[in-house]
């Protein structure tokens, strides 16, 4: 499970999760627009249904999806900095929130993993510490709290996809 915190000034969300897979694989899950709709979401909640990305500094991206209530949403922005497979910095403009001007920074650090099998998708014996930093909430505590809950779910979904192949379609539905 991801660890997550909101800074005392309520401006920054910081989260971390360990993924038992090489950072190249984690980077791919985060940046490949054909993979994002496979893992970003859960039945009974919301899910991304379409993503597109011009993956370069200055390039634009968007993800569209639908909530359990049928309401559509969209997140879009621009890539500010990219250093594969270590770093992604992007603006974050969601249709479902009143925040503007926020920035998401993803840092991926390779870490050794002891006791893993030497065959299968993680045969390299390395894992990835994913650090997420979402800035720009400007004392908007309700939005920061909402996004913190969302990032906790998203990081868990990504971890389950990369480690176990779990998708939004195969994941256990959220109970009402």
Predicted regions and their residues:
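Beta-strand/loop substructures that line and gate deep hydrophobic ligand-binding cavities in soluble
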Residues: 12, 16, 89-152
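Short, highly charged C-terminal tails/helix-capping segments
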Residues: 160-176
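Non-transmembrane alpha-helical segments in soluble domains
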Residues: 27, 37, 152-155, 159
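A generic structural motif
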Residues: 82-83, 112
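Short beta-edge strand/loop motif at the mouth of beta-sheet-based domains
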Residues: 14, 34-72, 171-176
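Short coil-to-beta-strand transition motifs
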Residues: 71-75, 100-101
């Amino acid at each position: 499970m991801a660890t997550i915190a909101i800074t005392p000034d309520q401006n920054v969300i910081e989260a971390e999760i360990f993924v038992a897979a090489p950072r190249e694989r984690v980077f791919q899950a985060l940046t490949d627009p054909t993979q994002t709709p496979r893992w970003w979401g859960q039945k009974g909640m919301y899910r991304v249904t379409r993503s597109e990305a011009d993956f370069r500094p200055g390039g634009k991206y968007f993800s569209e999806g639908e909530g359990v209530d049928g309401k559509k949403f969209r997140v879009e922005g621009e890539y500010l900095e990219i250093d594969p497979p270590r770093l992604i910095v992007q603006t974050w403009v969601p249709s479902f929130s009143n925040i503007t001007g926020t920035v998401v920074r993803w840092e991926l650090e390779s870490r050794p993993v002891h006791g893993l099998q030497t065959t299968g998708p993680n045969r390299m014996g390395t894992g990835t510490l994913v650090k997420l930093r979402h800035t720009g909430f400007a004392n908007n505590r309700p939005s920061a709290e909402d996004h913190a809950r969302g990032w906790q779910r998203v990081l868990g979904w990504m971890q389950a996809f990369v480690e176990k192949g779990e998708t939004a379609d195969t994941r256990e539905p959220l109970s009402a």
